[in-house]
Design a protein with these regions (language model features):
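Acidic/His-rich structured neighborhood in mature extracellular/periplasmic domains
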Residues: 1-126, 170, 179-182
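Helix N-terminus capping/helix-initiation residues
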Residues: 107-108, 131, 193
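Short alpha-helix capping/helix-loop boundary micro-motifs
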Residues: 129-141
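C-terminal soluble interaction/assembly domains
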Residues: 138, 143-215
Length: 215
């Protein structure tokens, strides 16, 4: 049984970004009730905004990006920009190849097959991203990336597309990441610039950037 869980006390990187997006949409539309917020969060979190079962959730962030562009919540900033010169070919299968790590998949062949069908359906899609070495020169990117944009870190880890997500924030002319840190166990604005943060992580290839519509 799948239901919408709202928990603002315990956030991972994805639920942090989802909640920021939901609150932003509510602010833009002048929605002020908790039920409005829950309705928007549900729309963001699930394929087509509908909860049927565990497989209704947008489990990989590339899926989240695609479906929420379709629903009109976000746009991808990188489209057609020469700075975003690298290409990621989607090839996700981490969940189905490691189904023992997911309690809903380890005991349910129908769910496993359903997730695998989604994986196969979207694998092969190509996405432009900004290579991490291009983050070094703030002058190049300051006109492209705004504070409040969603940053998705592209990874070369097998079976995954995005390793971490957060919110862009400019501080003294340098781009930083606001994110739910698994290391610090809380939401932080990282002391490191996004360039330095990315260079420390060998598996990080670069970033995709999404903007909440209306901001």
């Amino acid at each position: 049984y799948e239901r919408l869980i709202v928990n603002l006390r315990q956030l991972d990187c994805t639920t942090f970004v989802e909640n920021v997006t939901a609150l932003s949409v509510c602010a833009r539309e002048n929605y002020s009730s908790f039920s409005d917020y829950c309705r928007i969060l549900k729309k963001l979190r699930y394929w087509g905004g509908e909860i049927k079962n565990y497989t209704s959730r947008l489990h990989y962030f590339s899926w989240w990006g695609l479906d929420n562009q379709k629903k009109g919540f976000i746009t991808e900033v990188s489209c057609g920009d020469s700075l975003f010169s690298a290409t990621q070919v989607l090839s996700v299968d981490y969940m189905t190849n490691n189904s023992h790590l997911y309690k809903h998949l380890s005991s349910n062949a129908f769910y496993r097959d359903s997730i695998r069908n989604y994986e196969n359906l979207y694998n092969g899609l190509k996405f432009s991203f900004l290579p991490k070495n291009r983050l070094k020169n703030s002058k190049d990117i300051i006109s492209k990336i705004r504070s409040g944009d969603i940053i998705a870190i592209v990874t070369n880890k097998k079976g995954l597309d995005i390793s971490h997500v957060g919110i862009a924030i400019w501080i003294k002319g340098k781009l930083h990441l606001m994110h739910a840190s698994s290391l610090k166990k809380k939401v932080i604005i990282d002391d490191l610039t996004l360039y330095d943060y990315s260079m420390k992580q060998k598996s990080n290839l670069g970033i995709r950037v999404f903007r909440i519509v209306g901001f």
